[in-house]
């Protein structure tokens, strides 16, 4: 059946290509159709031709050279340097003879691409190698280098994975698509361990696979993967909406226990979730609480990950097409639009989203081709969950920092490495640069620095204002001199014993990491301030402190339990959240186009989810459901 489809596609391609094009072979690689040719320049010079063929066959098409026409790598390197302007600042060139691609890493990748792709086409024409152009981040990133190295070293294995996947995807559906159902396997009427299982007569897809970092035990920390209808053997695809551990943290487990299929996400999500998963493993090891997977399973997931840009339509199963749209939550966060069958049903899973532009990101997308079912988060769905404006939140932060510095104190801001940390860095950089906040050192601890490096490698995912600032004004706030990377415990002691300063450190809920160590050092001094800017889950130390706990039993540096008396100033500043508040959630339902027929709510405490569902139904007369974990809902 697959061979019949491939032969049909080949015939269409051959009929449409000019006769002088020498096609060596056509094959499936994952969701793409790859054409290997002995004279690729003829095709690449006519971009509209391939675009039109792709539209006709409804598949993504990649053009590569046949191995027989590839230039010797050493000669190709010299030729590439002749073609590409020196201003591009090429940092590395490597060759993948499995895919016949040349990987070019540069500080200014746009100059390697050239106007309308002109420079890239020259590289193909003169060397035969198909250029794959990557940005060299201004901040060196160990994670990005490890991922790129893994993909280079395992290119042959990855091609085999993609070919097998291509054969799986490009089959004709066996059954009519007359039903679709969703099973809540985590993150429903709760926050954490998000996991949603989509079943159709032909396919099985998992949307997110997270952990609850504040769960306490295995029963409450991990998704319900033991439901009878779920098996790894039957799973066609996994979609990860964004990198936070409550959405991606349990993904390596699937590979540990036999899953060998694809993961779909944006490129920033792949990079960031790899960072967070490796850190999760490291912390668990240090705390002698091993996880049910290890580093090699993270590596395996990287090899199976297929990255997609926003708006890129991709076949992920014989009867399902996926398109990712901006969610505005963190870098690379996405809403997943799933087109089931020949349009019999369309659903959107929002993941976590922010329906407001921030300094860091654009507002979440709200226009889709079709929607029958919307699965939407409800983190701040309670009627009282109205957050102040960003401007007001920033003023409140400045006020708190100013008063603390006047007392000679230090400001500890526990943050997630990804999202709020970068938002705050942009705010602090501007206010210190313009003199609104006194120039004091801002210490960056934990994974935040590495996460910053990933942000600098993916500027196309940042807000337009920030992109303009970086590219047109030459000002990148992430590499400002006010920020200092913390290296090791000795430096942390110097910071807490030193002059007034601002400390940004993980974890965001004080559930571990270096922020907890800073808290223990600083909490008994009333001159210091602890500022919460993000969500504090029920059961976390952060939530207990918010509730007013003044005596906190924790292990000290000698691993002995002692009670810490909290005397520092505690401040919670709403408005920096990467989640939509109550007004934004209601506005999103009002503005989304087209209107869904039904809405399922997830990712919210029990009463907030129910409160939001009731309000949506009363206001918009749209059917709403609030499934519990383990419940299944038929959506078609």
Swiss-Prot record:
Keywords: DNA-binding, Endonuclease, Exonuclease, Hydrolase, Metal-binding, Nuclease, RNA-binding, Transcription, Transcription regulation, Transcription termination, Zinc
Superkingdom of source: Archaea
Single GO biological process annotation from the record: DNA-templated transcription termination
Cited PROSITE patterns: KH_TYPE_1 (PS50084)
Temperature curve summary: Optimum temperature is 22-37 degrees Celsius, less active at 55 degrees Celsius.
Cofactor note: Binds 2 Zn(2+) ions, which are required for nuclease activity.
EC number: 3.1.-.-
Mechanisms controlling activity: Most active at 0.5 M or 0.7 M NaCl, less active at 1.0 M NaCl. Nuclease activity is inhibited by N,N,Tetrakis-(2-pyridylmethyl)-ethylene diamine (TPEN), a specific chelator of zinc ions.
Ranges for region Beta-Casp: 384-577
UniProt GO molecular function: DNA binding; exonuclease activity; identical protein binding; RNA binding; RNA endonuclease activity; RNA nuclease activity; zinc ion binding
Listed Pfam families: Beta-Casp, KH_TffA, Lactamase_B_6, RMMBL
Binding positions for Zn(2+) 1 per the UniProt entry: 242, 244, 329, 352
Family assignment from sequence similarity: Belongs to the metallo-beta-lactamase superfamily. RNA-metabolizing metallo-beta-lactamase-like family. FttA subfamily.
Biological role: Terminates transcription on the whole genome. Termination is linked to FttA-mediated RNA cleavage and does not require NTP hydrolysis. Cleaves endonucleolytically at the RNA exit channel of RNA polymerase (RNAP); the 5'-3' exonuclease activity of this protein degrades the nascent RNA released from RNAP.
Domain remarks: The KHb domain binds ssRNA better than the KHa domain.
Protein name: Transcription termination factor FttA
Organism phylogeny: Archaea, Methanobacteriati, Methanobacteriota, Methanomada group, Methanobacteria
């Amino acid at each position: 059946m697959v061979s019949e489809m491939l032969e049909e596609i080949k015939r269409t391609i051959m009929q449409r290509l000019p006769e002088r094009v020498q096609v060596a072979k056509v094959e499936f690689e994952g969701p793409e159709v790859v054409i290997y040719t002995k004279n690729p320049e003829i095709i690449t010079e006519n971009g509209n031709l391939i675009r039109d063929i792709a539209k006709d066959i409804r598949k993504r098409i990649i053009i590569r050279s046949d191995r027989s026409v590839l230039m010797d790598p050493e000669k190709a390197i010299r030729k590439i340097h002749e073609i590409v302007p020196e201003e591009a600042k090429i940092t590395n060139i490597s060759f993948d003879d499995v895919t016949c691609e040349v990987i070019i890493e540069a500080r200014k990748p746009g100059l390697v691409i050239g106007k309308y792709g002109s420079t890239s086409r020259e590289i193909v024409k003169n060397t035969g190698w198909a250029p794959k152009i990557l940005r060299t981040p201004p901040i060196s990133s160990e994670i990005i280098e490890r991922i790129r190295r893994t993909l280079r070293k395992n290119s042959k294995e990855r091609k085999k994975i993609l070919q097998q996947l291509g054969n799986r995807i490009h089959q004709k559906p066996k059954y009519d698509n007359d039903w679709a159902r969703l099973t809540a396997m985590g993150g429903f009427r709760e926050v954490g361990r998000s996991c949603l299982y989509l079943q159709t007569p032909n396919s099985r897809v998992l949307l997110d696979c997270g952990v609850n970092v504040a769960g306490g035990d295995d029963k409450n920390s991990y998704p319900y993967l033991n439901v009878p209808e779920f098996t790894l053997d039957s799973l066609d695809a996994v979609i990860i909406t964004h990198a936070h551990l409550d959405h991606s943290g349990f993904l390596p487990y699937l590979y540990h226990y036999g899953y060998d299929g694809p993961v779909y996400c944006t490129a920033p999500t792949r990079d960031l979730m790899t960072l967070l998963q490796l850190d999760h493993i490291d912390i668990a090891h240090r705390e002698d609480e091993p996880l049910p997977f290890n580093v090699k399973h993270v590596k395996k997931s990287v090899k199976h990950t297929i990255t997609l840009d926003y708006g890129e339509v991709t076949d992920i199963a014989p009867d399902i097409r996926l398109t990712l749209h901006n969610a505005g939550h963190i870098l690379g966060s996405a809403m997943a639009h799933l087109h089931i069958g020949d349009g019999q049903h369309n659903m959107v899973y929002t993941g976590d989203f922010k329906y407001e532009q921030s300094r860091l990101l654009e507002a979440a997308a709200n226009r889709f081709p079709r929607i029958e079912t919307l699965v939407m988060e409800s983190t701040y769905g309670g009627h009282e969950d109205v957050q102040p404006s960003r401007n007001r939140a920033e003023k409140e932060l400045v006020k708190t920092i100013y008063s603390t510095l006047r007392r000679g104190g230090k400001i500890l801001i526990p943050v997630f490495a990804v999202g709020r940390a970068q938002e705050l860095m942009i705010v602090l950089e501007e206010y210190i640069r313009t003199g609104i906040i006194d120039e004091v050192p801002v210490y960056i601890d934990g994974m935040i620095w590495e996460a910053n490096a990933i942000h600098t490698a993916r500027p196309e995912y940042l807000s337009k204002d920030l992109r303009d600032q970086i590219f047109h004004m030459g000002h990148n706030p992430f590499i400002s001199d006010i920020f200092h990377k913390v290296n090791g415990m000795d430096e942390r002691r110097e910071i807490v014993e030193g002059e007034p300063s601002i400390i940004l450190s993980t974890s965001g809920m004080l559930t571990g990491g270096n922020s907890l160590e800073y808290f223990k050092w600083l909490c008994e001094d009333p001159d210091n301030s602890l500022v919460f800017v993000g969500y504090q889950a029920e059961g976390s130390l952060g939530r207990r402190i918010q509730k007013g706990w003044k005596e906190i039993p924790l292990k000290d540096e000698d691993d002995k339990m002692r009670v810490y008396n909290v005397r520092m100033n505690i401040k919670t500043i709403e408005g920096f959240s990467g989640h939509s508040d109550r007004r934004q959630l209601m506005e999103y339902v009002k503005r989304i186009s087209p209107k869904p027929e039904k809405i399922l709510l997830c990712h919210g405490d029990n009463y907030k989810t129910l409160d939001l569902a009731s309000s949506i139904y009363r206001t918009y007369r749209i059917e709403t459901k609030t499934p519990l974990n383990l419940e299944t809902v038929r959506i078609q």
